[in-house]
């Protein structure tokens, strides 16, 4: 046996991660808690918009511009933080982003004019939006392909909780204590999140700690990790484990852009981003449409959003479990050889189902609201839309982390960039579209666009494996990282 073969055999016997199931559960809970900040900061704000416009003496259109700007920075900021976390560590990046978020929330609670509101909402988005990409990076560090989708489903379900309850909390706070209380709530919530991360979350970046057995730099140590290391880690490690840790990488702020324009990811990202934009356009239009057609109150509008949130949470948990089951089933057909198994077949073959459900729910929602059909029908469509849309997002997110395992945060940031920019554009035009061609035809147009661009998914499934193998052949370090997943 050659020396290289012996080293490979030794490395293959090492666990991918030393974190136990209970420790993984704790880590996933923490990153899901952090990811809710982005959703809360976005959704809790909507019920307060009319009150803010009156208090600052500006038009509703100008207040709506703060929503568009928030989405733009929500797409841009993870490209910075994601690249940093892939090289400097997850913990320090989490702490930096949340400090920015807390400062913005305090400033927003004390803002006195529209200019301050607009600028600070952009800063707030810069701090909160990256928690999703960072969470995906942590999941890539501690999970294997066979279990990743299940954990991704739990993570996605946690971060979608604010979609369901954010508008309700925002409506109650702004109604009882004024719109500034919304930002004080976010300050307290964000402060609790920072405290948990500082005290508990361990560093997971594999280029720093390998499978978790290596001691990170002092600034990356958490008190809990230090205690666990003294109690458990030393007995599980030995000098030969050094080979497990990947070589450190330089920070590449263009990393997300490079991932975006890889042929083996561009089609998947653009495909799911269009579906995300359609989803956001429906979410943006719902409150105005149901008030006009069904004469609902603000509280009733907030309760309608619960249907979408419930569908999203249920969908992401179930699709994660299904993806793990399906992956293991297909892997058995290839004799357990992950290098021969086409990951596109294992991950993407259900996208047609979720896309079809989203298209049907958008179409029926549009026409039932347009014709004033009983409100229960659009509410059911709203539930199905949340289920289908987030299931599709979870499928693509898991796939991207699988094929860009060594740059998982950057890969998620590239997805976030495209879908947030398209979402910002969509939310800006949905109102004028409805005014121009009416509700039913607006959502018919959205459905048609999603159907036409379904060809991108077909291209990804047909050619993705060949493109990925070509990229790995041209980048030996990336290929080695994938082998170690």
Model-predicted regions and their roles:
Residues 15-22, 148-150, 175-263, 317, ...:
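Central mid-sequence intracellular linker of multi-pass
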Residues 76-115:
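Conserved MFS/SLC helix-loop-helix module at the cytosolic interface between two early adjacent transmembrane helices
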Residues 39, 68-71, 109, 125, ...:
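C-terminal transmembrane bundle
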Residues 120-160:
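Cytoplasmic helix-loop-helix junction between adjacent transmembrane helices
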Residues 41, 56-57, 88-89, 110-116, ...:
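Helix-breaking motifs and short loop linkers at transmembrane-helix boundaries and internal kinks
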Residues 113-121, 133, 183, 268, ...:
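Short hydrophobic/alpha-helical segments at membrane-entry points of transmembrane helices
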Residues 147-177, 181-193, 308-316, 416-426:
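Glycine-rich segments within core transmembrane alpha-helices of 12-TM secondary carriers
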Residues 1-41, 50, 54:
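Cytosolic juxtamembrane N-terminal segment immediately preceding the first transmembrane helix
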């Amino acid at each position: 046996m050659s020396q290289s073969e012996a080293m490979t055999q030794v490395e293959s016997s090492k666990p991918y991660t030393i974190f136990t199931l209970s420790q993984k559960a704790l880590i996933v809970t923490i990153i899901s808690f952090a990811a809710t900040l982005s959703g809360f900061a976005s959704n809790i704000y909507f019920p307060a918009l009319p009150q803010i416009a009156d208090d600052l003496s500006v038009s509703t259109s100008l207040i709506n511009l703060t929503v568009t700007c928030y989405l733009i920075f929500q797409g841009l900021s993870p490209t910075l933080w994601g690249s940093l976390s892939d090289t400097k560590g997850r913990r320090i990046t989490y702490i930096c982003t949340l400090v920015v978020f807390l400062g913005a929330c305090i400033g927003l609670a004390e803002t006195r004019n529209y200019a301050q509101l607009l600028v600070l909402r952009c800063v707030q988005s810069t701090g909160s939006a990256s928690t999703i990409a960072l969470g995906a990076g942590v999941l890539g560090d501690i999970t294997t392909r066979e279990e990743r989708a299940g954990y991704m489903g739990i993570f996605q379900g946690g971060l979608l909780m604010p979609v369901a309850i954010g508008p309700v909390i925002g409506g109650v706070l702004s109604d009882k204590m004024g719109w500034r209380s919304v930002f004080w709530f976010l300050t307290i919530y964000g402060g609790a999140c920072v405290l948990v991360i500082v005290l508990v979350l361990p560093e997971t970046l594999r280029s720093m700690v390998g499978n978790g057995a290596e001691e990170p730099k002092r600034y990356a140590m958490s008190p809990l990790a230090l205690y666990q290391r003294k109690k458990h880690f030393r007995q599980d490690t030995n000098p030969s484990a050094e080979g497990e840790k990947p070589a450190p990488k330089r920070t590449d702020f263009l990393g997300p852009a490079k991932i975006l324009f890889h042929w083996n990811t561009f089609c998947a990202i653009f495909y799911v981003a269009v579906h995300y934009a359609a989803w956001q356009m429906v979410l943006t239009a719902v409150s105005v449409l149901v008030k006009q057609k069904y004469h609902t109150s603000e509280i009733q509008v907030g309760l309608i959003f619960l249907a979408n949130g419930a569908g999203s949470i249920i969908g992401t948990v179930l699709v994660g479990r299904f993806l793990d089951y399906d992956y293991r089933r297909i892997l058995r057909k290839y004799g357990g050889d992950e290098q021969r198994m086409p990951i596109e077949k294992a991950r993407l073959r259900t996208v047609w189902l979720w896309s079809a459900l989203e298209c049907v729910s958008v179409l029926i929602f549009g026409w039932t609201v347009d014709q004033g059909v009983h409100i229960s029908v659009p509410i059911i469509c709203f539930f199905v839309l949340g289920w289908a849309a987030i299931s599709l997002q979870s499928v693509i997110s898991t796939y991207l982390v699988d094929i860009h395992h060594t740059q998982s945060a950057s890969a998620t940031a590239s997805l976030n960039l495209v879908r947030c920019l398209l979402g910002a554009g969509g939310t800006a035009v949905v109102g004028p579209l409805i005014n121009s061609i009416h509700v039913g035809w607006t959502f018919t147009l959205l459905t048609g666009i999603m159907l036409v661009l379904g060809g991108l998914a077909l291209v990804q499934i047909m050619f993705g494996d060949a493109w990925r193998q070509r990229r790995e052949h041209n980048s030996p370090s990336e290929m080695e990282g994938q082998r170690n997943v």
